[in-house]
A protein has these predicted regions:
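Short secondary-structure junctions
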Residues: 147-155
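Membrane-interface segments at or immediately adjacent to transmembrane helices
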Residues: 22-64
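Short hydrophobic/aromatic beta-strand or adjacent loop that forms the aromatic wall/cage
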Residues: 157-162
């Protein structure tokens, strides 16, 4: 019992130390104290995601942005509707419903979608992981959809592309 209790205490102490070091490494107190601007803090922690979310703020109010391979929408600007791809399956789901790229543009437009935020690195991660339901035809149709059916509005590094529906 003594040994198990000692080991448990040691593990808890290491966990507390790791959490404390992580807290101070993230430096949230600088933002809370006002010595670091919030957007600068977010950019340093979230990278291109923060830049893309900030750029959405320039879109017209009431814009509806549908995300592909991006599950995070917490920093979506007020006045906009962001639809995250929570299960990273939006493209797969639409393809299984039989919608072709042209039909998607029309259908999404009828639903009020004005823009598509494509997380290129997220799609590449899913593809390289060999996500079974998506086959080569699905990926080819996605590429065609992005290049022929949508209009590039803005690019954020190699991570994100914001498209608008024509």
């Amino acid at each position: 019992r003594f040994i198990i209790g000692g080991l448990l205490g040691f593990v808890l102490a290491l966990t507390a130390l790791q959490a404390t070091l992580g807290f101070f490494a993230a430096s949230p107190l600088r933002v809370i104290g006002g010595s670091e601007p919030e957007q600068e803090f977010l950019s340093s922690r979230l990278g291109q995601h923060a830049v893309a979310m900030q750029a959405l703020d320039r879109l017209p109010e009431d814009s509806r942005i549908r995300f592909l391979w991006e599950p995070r929408s917490y920093y979506c600007p007020t006045g906009l509707t962001c639809e995250p791809d929570s299960l990273l399956d939006r493209w797969w789901h639409e393809r299984r419903l039989g919608a072709g790229p042209g039909e998607l543009v029309a259908g999404w437009g009828q639903q009020g979608v004005t823009h598509v935020l494509y997380y290129r690195l997220g799609a590449e991660a899913v593809r390289s992981a060999g996500f079974d339901p998506l086959n080569d035809d699905d990926w080819k149709e996605l590429e065609r959809f992005l290049t022929e059916d949508l209009v590039v509005a803005e690019t954020f590094g190699d991570a994100y592309v914001l498209y608008r529906l024509p």
